[in-house]
Swiss-Prot record:
Organism: Oryza sativa subsp. japonica (Rice)
Glycosylation sites: N107, N207
Key words of the record: Cell wall, Cell wall biogenesis/degradation, Glycoprotein, Membrane, Secreted, Signal
Domain Expansin-like EG45: 41-145
Any one GO CC term of the record: membrane
Signal sequence range: 1-21
Gene from which the chain derives: EXPA20
Domain Expansin-like CBD: 155-234
Protein name: Expansin-A20
Function: May cause loosening and extension of plant cell walls by disrupting non-covalent bonding between cellulose microfibrils and matrix glucans. No enzymatic activity has been found. May be required for rapid internodal elongation in deepwater rice during submergence.
Length: 240
């Protein structure tokens, strides 16, 4: 009897927790099939989400959440709003997802998550299709360090930054070749940052500031002699 009472108290605590001011209302549905394979790729540019260590717990974000790609890589804790949809919500369940795609075609002006089906089924009944939710942005946890994927050609470098912990996203970034000073980069699309410079053959360092306000200098993250299309892992990671 004592164990049952403790379980009931835990459920009640979960039900009232969303009343805190750091929870925001929204809606969620799902896409990508039962195995989530249809969520690979997307407007953040991550490609295969397993290769980039994001996995199946991902979501496409509506226009205000996506913020023209500035929110790519951010993490969100989501629960189904049981008080509004008791027949369709799974009581006491929560899931953390990473924003990896743009889903602006759904409720474009409102907070909306188009989640992978496996992630969505943690919180909602499949037949519901769409449910009211409560969400909050949370710290991202990643295995290993930040990774840089170098694409582009000649005098155009396009750098995809992946596996970023902390706030999960970037507010500013610059690059320095072994023969240059620091060059400011700009967001091209999603999590891809660009610069127009001839850096081929040079070792590359990156100065990255997260949306949480933390700056890390990745000295010689890319060794001299690199080629376009290569991925480079680091030992550094963001805390916020």
């Amino acid at each position: 009897m004592g164990n049952i009472l403790l379980q009931l108290l835990a459920v009640v605590a979960l039900c009232i927790a969303p009343a805190r001011s750091d929870w925001l209302p929204g809606t969620a549905t799902f896409y990508g099939g039962a195995d989530g394979s249809g969520t690979m790729g997307g407007a953040c540019g991550y490609g295969n989400l397993y290769d980039q260590r994001y996995g199946i717990n991902n979501a496409a974000l509506s226009t205000p959440l996506f913020n023209d790609g500035a929110s790519c890589g951010q993490c969100y804790l989501i629960i189904c709003d049981y008080g509004k949809a008791p027949d369709w919500c799974k009581l006491g369940k929560a899931i953390t997802v990473t924003g990896t795609n743009y889903g602006g075609w759904c409720n474009a002006t409102r907070p909306y998550f188009d989640m992978s089906q496996p992630a969505w089924e943690n919180i909602g009944i499949y037949s519901a299709g769409i449910v009211p939710i409560l969400y909050q942005q949370v710290k991202c946890w990643r295995y290993g360090g930040v990774r840089f994927i170098i694409n582009g050609f000649n005098y155009f470098e396009l750098v995809l930054v992946t596996n970023m912990a902390g706030s999960g996203s970037i507010v500013s970034m610059s690059v320095k070749g072994s023969c240059t000073g620091w060059i400011q980069m700009t967001r091209n699309w999603g999590a891809n940052w660009q610069c127009l410079a001839g850096l081929a053959g040079q070792a590359l360092s990156f100065n990255v500031t997260s949306t949480g306000g933390q700056t890390i200098v990745f000295d010689d993250a890319v060794p001299a002699g690199w080629s376009f299309g290569q991925t480079f892992s680091t030992y550094h990671q963001f805390d916020y």
